[in-house]
Amino acid sequence: MGFHAYSSPYDWSRIAGFKAAAKAVPGGMINLSVGSPVDSVPDAVQQALASTADASNAHGYPVTAGTVDMKSAIDSWFRNMRGVDLKAVNAAVIPTVGSKEAVALMASLLHLGEGDVVVQPKVSYPTYEIGTQLAGATVAKVDDVTDVDSWVNIPNVKAIWIN
């Protein structure tokens, strides 16, 4: 699976002005951005991390292919907790490092590419567009994806992102 170039900016400079204005308001700004945890790490977790920090395999990102046992456990959880039999609907369990990776790879995992169109809301998560472009597909932005008439006549729509 190769990737195509993408042209959409993904930088925080687009929101810098809004951030500055919010900080000027009494009480400041509430930061709800991606990757900004606010809760402290529990002591037990800190101790477990510290005790394994020097292990030979403790550096770098983990392999995300997942073990057979892990995929089986996920499959069982969906069946037991949600009543969904993933095998019956021919679904695959694809572990990722995080949801952003899953979103960025989704168009490629769906085998979308040149000539395919992905519909998304005009105001949406930037990674929708970046992932679509990486797959080589085209983005079609609409005001409201639930307004099917706004995109139903766009040729070659293969996927729709819904916020």
Stretches found by the model and what they are:
Residues 2-98:
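N-terminal small-domain helix-loop-helix segment of the aminotransferase-like
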Residues 58-163:
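Conserved core of the PLP fold type I
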